[in-house]
């Protein structure tokens, strides 16, 4: 190996990289081989090229290693607590979808049976894990993934986002590689917010409700979407990227507030006549249990048009998270909040100790706010804000203790100093 200032046996002879032609004085390192030399810059460039090729070929290379439903569900268990029924539905639907893409295409022409696409609808309360389930699936399958907010969508020609912007976002996630985008996953959040405003047609055009549902129909079912290259604006002389959406898996999610009442009304209606089944009102069921009885007709009554419901044949319902589930979410998943804060404090060489009663108090606060798991981080951030602000300036702190009184705002976190047996509370401002 030759360095910039190397003047041993090659004293007086200037060495050059055989690839880029730079001299030994222009680079940090020059590696010698049999009659050839390569500099550190060319080595880095070669590594980048090889890394890009490996990433590009990963989906094809893993084509025969598609995870089976049990493995998919097990991976979801690492990140999402509970929701076993939803995980099972998702695992089977996703497995069949990508099996259709990876195996079905190889047999095209030999078999006349054409497998249809099974898009998915997730129905569950806010903070129950709908978005996290979709994100984890995309990461597991190593496919492009994007999240779209249905509330920002409008019909083409109106102020707001065009539905084709969804495909543009997906392309951005994979550097405008059309082939990769065509096997991606799109999660459309807040899908319940585009329900039509009333059952009766109105003179006033519903551009953000039924109009958006109509616009999404073809996109979800499968069409050729024209997308401007590199996110430019559309104009007549421009060449568009043509993206076939027939192999893109669409997962729609929404809280559907009030849907449980529609389900109860339907299930409590009795028939007419002597043979009619008499049904009594069951007020003991919670929202999650009621949603398990969901039928497509309930979604139509809620405000989704029948054609749109038909494009989402796989329906998975998520349970409302109780206190025990929220405590488990705080502690057990791979990326749990307790583990994340432990890592943050570890960077300051400080141990953080969340007592069991503290985690229960956090869960209780989240239940009062009705934000599900989504509200847990906000509560933790507020509690630890002052400590994280002052800790980098403190010396000899080895441990921070958080109990239920800290969560309730009755006291500050306890700081334990290494040079003293005493524990000193952080003074409140």
From Swiss-Prot:
GO terms for cellular component: HslUV protease complex. Keywords: ATP-binding, Chaperone, Metal-binding, Nucleotide-binding, Zinc. SMART domains: AAA, ClpB_D2-small, zf-C4_ClpX. Zn(2+) binds at residues 17, 20, 39, 42. One of its GO terms (molecular function) is zinc ion binding. Component of the ClpX-ClpP complex. Forms a hexameric ring that, in the presence of ATP, binds to fourteen ClpP subunits assembled into a disk-like structure with a central cavity, resembling the structure of eukaryotic proteasomes. Belongs to the ClpX chaperone family. ATP-dependent specificity component of the Clp protease. It directs the protease to specific substrates. Can perform chaperone functions in the absence of ClpP. PANTHER family: ATP-DEPENDENT CLP PROTEASE ATP-BINDING SUBUNIT CLPX-LIKE, MITOCHONDRIAL, ATP-DEPENDENT CLP PROTEASE ATP-BINDING SUBUNIT CLPX-LIKE, MITOCHONDRIAL-RELATED. This is ATP-dependent Clp protease ATP-binding subunit ClpX. It comes from Teredinibacter turnerae (strain ATCC 39867 / T7901).
């Amino acid at each position: 190996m030759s360095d910039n200032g190397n003047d041993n046996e090659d004293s007086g002879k200037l060495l050059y990289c055989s690839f880029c032609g730079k001299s030994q004085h222009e680079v940090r390192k020059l590696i010698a081989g049999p009659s050839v030399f390569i500099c550190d810059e060319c080595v880095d460039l070669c590594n980048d090229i090889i890394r890009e090729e490996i990433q590009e070929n990963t989906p094809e290379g893993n084509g025969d290693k598609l995870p089976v439903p049990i493995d998919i569900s097990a991976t979801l268990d690492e990140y999402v607590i509970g929701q076993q029924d939803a995980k099972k539905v998702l695992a089977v639907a996703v497995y069949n979808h990508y099996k259709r893409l990876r195996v079905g295409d190889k047999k095209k022409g030999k078999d006349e049976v054409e497998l249809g696409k099974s898009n998915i609808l997730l129905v569950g309360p806010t903070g129950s894990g709908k978005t996290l389930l979709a994100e984890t699936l995309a990461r597991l399958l190593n496919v492009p993934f994007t999240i779209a907010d249905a509330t920002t969508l409008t019909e083409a020609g109106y102020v707001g986002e065009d539905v084709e912007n969804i495909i543009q976002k997906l392309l951005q996630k994979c550097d405008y590689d059309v082939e990769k985008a065509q096997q991606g996953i799109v999660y459309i959040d807040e899908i319940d917010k585009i329900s039509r405003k009333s059952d009766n047609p109105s003179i006033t055009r519903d551009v953000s409700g039924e109009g958006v549902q109509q616009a999404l129909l073809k996109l979800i079912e499968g069409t050729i979407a024209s997308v401007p290259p590199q996110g430019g604006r559309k104009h007549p002389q421009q060449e568009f990227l043509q993206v076939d959406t027939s192999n893109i898996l669409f997962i729609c999610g929404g809280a559907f507030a009030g849907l449980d009442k529609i389900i109860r009304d339907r299930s409590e209606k009795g028939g007419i006549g002597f043979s009619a089944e008499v049904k009594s009102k069951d007020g003991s069921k919670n929202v999650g249990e009621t949603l398990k009885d969901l039928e497509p007709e309930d979604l139509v009554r809620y405000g989704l048009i029948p054609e749109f419901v038909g494009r989402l044949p796989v329906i998975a319902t998520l349970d409302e998270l109780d206190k025990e589930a929220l405590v488990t979410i705080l502690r057990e998943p791979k990326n749990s909040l307790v583990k994340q804060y432990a890592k943050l404090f570890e960077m300051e060489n400080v141990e953080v100790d969340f007592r069991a009663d503290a985690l229960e108090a956090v869960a209780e606060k989240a239940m009062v706010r009705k934000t599900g798991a989504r509200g847990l981080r906000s509560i933790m951030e507020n509690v630890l804000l002052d400590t994280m602000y002052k800790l980098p300036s403190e010396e000899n702190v080895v441990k921070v203790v958080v109990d239920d009184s800290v969560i309730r705002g009755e006291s500050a976190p306890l700081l334990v100093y290494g040079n003293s047996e005493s524990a000193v509370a952080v003074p409140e401002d």
